[in-house]
Amino acid sequence: SNIFKSYDIRGKYPIEINEKIICEIISSFISNFRIQNSEFIIVIGHDSRLSSPSLYHAAIKSIKYQVLNIKLIKAEISTTPMLYFLTNHFNADMGIMITASHNPKEYNGLKIVGKNAVPISGKEILRIMNNG
């Protein structure tokens, strides 16, 4: 099945979405968005699903491994609107929310926004994943 949806990435945990897949997705997005040698600001948060803390910590490790000049703002447990607010407030380059929104508890995923908390569309997600 396809985990790439219109404005997010989600699937059943741990079969379709897991720590390894989250790291691969984040790696592709950072490669696409990062400007060499400039500070890169990322806001990251997660919802209260049981699988979210593990995915959140895997994502943070992946970010720290790839980006040297980074300002990482950890929202910890948060709502998606709060993460979007923080992304805009801190003028972040990217916001990452670990959530599967309204989907059943066995699902999890990511919502990723760019500058000004602008959501990244499904077409853009696929382009980044195919090039990243």
Locate the predicted segments by residue.
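N-terminal amphipathic/basic leader segments beginning at the initiator methionine
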Residues: 1-15
